[in-house]
Amino acid sequence: MHLAQLRQPLTRAAANSCHSVCRLPTTHSSVSATAILSEQFAHLRIGPSSSNVAVEGRRYASVKAQGAYRLKPKRTIPKKLGAKKTGDQYVIPGNIIYKQRGTLWHPGENTIMGRDHTIHAAVAGYVKYYRDPQLHPDRQYIGVVFNRNDKLPYPKDAPRKRKLGLVAVPRKVEEVEKPTMSASGLPLFVTRHETIEIPPPAVTTPAAAGKAVKGQGARVSASGAAAVPASSSTISASASSNSNNGGSSVIAELIKEKLAARAEYNARQSALRKLQQQKMLARRGTRVLRLMNNYSYRETNWEIGRLIGDPGSVPGTEKVGSRKAKFRARRRRRNTFLLGIKERKLAKADRREEYRRRVREKREQRLVQRKEFLAKQREAKKAREGGAAAEKSEKKEVKAEKPAAAAPKVEKPKAPEAAKKESKPKVEEKKAAAAEPKKDSKTEKKD
């Protein structure tokens, strides 16, 4: 209640109290006077009692009841929309970062969206406003990062960052040495190797290879895999036939060198295959005997099972080489094939360009020849015209020196068209002359 409303009730109460105090007789003691004053001031107490109605005054409603300004959850007051946290500002889980109508901003890393499209922080960290073209070309996102220096978006294949409340400590891996001896002093395992003798590689010279081929002879098939023995008579016969047919002895020597190289290559490949087979057998023949509880040595069950090979394969029937080696060989063949196609295309393009170049050169050459020919023709024509003009001038000079006698005039024969034109009027005249006597005869008869 305002003081202005309490002014009149207070003045009235004070006036009544003073009036009663002034009437007090002087004969009373001080105790009775204090009691009277306390009674008078009791009337001034403001409270719910009926005696203070005049002091309280009237009450009027100034605002509406609570709940009159209640809005829907999605219809926030416009003045309260917008960003609540700026970039790089620290937030805790549940903090409102951006309040909006619709999705102007979308939730990104470590953020969530409420029912009214408000974006909240899901973890404690620093706010980042960013775009992610890989996720969406036009959307803009709000995220929260743990480290202030981090940048969003994170790389696509990067590991996800989580805050587990732990500290990254490098792991110390201590390599424990595996024991090789038992407590009783016996070795824990014994390895038995199958020894093989690897012959030293034979060094062959081209001359020795040529002699071997000349003595024994070899004929390689088209595939180059199998070598078929052939007598030296066939080689000499082929060489002699080539020489008899106009060839030279160089061709025969080239054939011999090629056959020798093929034989040497096949021998080297067969030796390599044998060595690989021996190594594989030695690897299979190696036995690892382990110490058992009864102080006996034996192979483990899984090693015994490996002796028969992998599941679904029979030992001794598989080809030498691993599965990945086959894949590498296939890839190498494919690359060689594709490289050959590319080289053929390039060669074809070069041939086409060479052909076009030759065509252009021939065209230019023909144009030059044509220009030369036309120039020669013009020169010849000018020469002929100059000779004709000289002859005419000479003739004129001769005529001027010797004037010719007057020749009799000879009538030229008329052209057939002129004769026809002259004949037409003559025919008309004849018709008119024939028609005149007929008219005269008719007139005479009438008379």
From Swiss-Prot:
GO terms for biological process: translation. InterPro entries: Ribosomal_bL27. Gene3D superfamilies: 2.40.50.100. The keyword Ribosomal protein applies. It is found in: Mitochondrion. Residues 377-447 are annotated as: Disordered. GO terms for cellular component: mitochondrial large ribosomal subunit. Residues 377-402, 409-447 have a biased composition (Basic and acidic residues). It holds the Pfam family Ribosomal_L27. Its main location: mitochondrion. Keywords: Mitochondrion, Ribonucleoprotein, Ribosomal protein. One of its GO terms (molecular function) is structural constituent of ribosome. The keyword Transport does not apply. Component of the mitochondrial ribosome (mitoribosome), a dedicated translation machinery responsible for the synthesis of mitochondrial genome-encoded proteins, including at least some of the essential transmembrane subunits of the mitochondrial respiratory chain. The mitoribosomes are attached to the mitochondrial inner membrane and translation products are cotranslationally integrated into the membrane. Belongs to the bacterial ribosomal protein bL27 family. Component of the mitochondrial large ribosomal subunit (mt-LSU). Mature N.crassa 74S mitochondrial ribosomes consist of a small (37S) and a large (54S) subunit. The 37S small subunit contains a 16S ribosomal RNA (16S mt-rRNA) and 32 different proteins. The 54S large subunit contains a 23S rRNA (23S mt-rRNA) and 42 different proteins. This is Large ribosomal subunit protein bL27m.
